[in-house]
Amino acid sequence: GGKEPPVAPVETPIVDKDGCRVKIINKIVSVYDANGKLLRQEDIIDYTRTNIKGEYASLSDFIHKWKASDKKKTIEQSFMAMGIDLKALKADQGMSDVDDFDFICYVAYGKKPLTRKERANNVKKKDFFSKYSAEAQAVLSILLDKYMNQGITEVEDIKVLSLADFAEFGKPAKIVKLFGGKALYEAAIKELEAHIYELEVS
């Protein structure tokens, strides 16, 4: 029996809010109507800007939504559903070290972006860590470094505590006890996030 031909990956069709089909090839976005007729083509950055502004009328709308969002990953996923891969776009623009938040504000509203490192350093200058035990402070410090290197969604997921970086503190269940339990650990993460984005006025 001959080998089966490789199965081509099934692409998830992207449909915009007007029900039009969207294809993205080489940074050019093509939008088709229900009959497959090409309606328009635009650059991926213009397409991204239009979609962000369609979703959030103003910069303060977006900041409010970002701060209110329980998990920043849901915002990232809403962009993916529109066919916008923030990570790839940032890499393409030479802005991989910039927070998704800053990148979105920059693309849509022309706001000067901060790098994740700048945001992390602003948190380090504050007295936020001092209310925690030395071990809990060390955990938060590693989480802040994770944010700086990889982004906020990495920090939000409690699975991060299973990584080798945290091995010296024990298993995740033991680590959350350093904060007084899971609820207080999650509250500490929320507070860390609030400090990361503190300079933003909504």
Give, region by region, the residue ranges found by the protein language model.
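Catalytic cores and motor modules of nucleic-acid processing enzymes
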Residues: 2-202
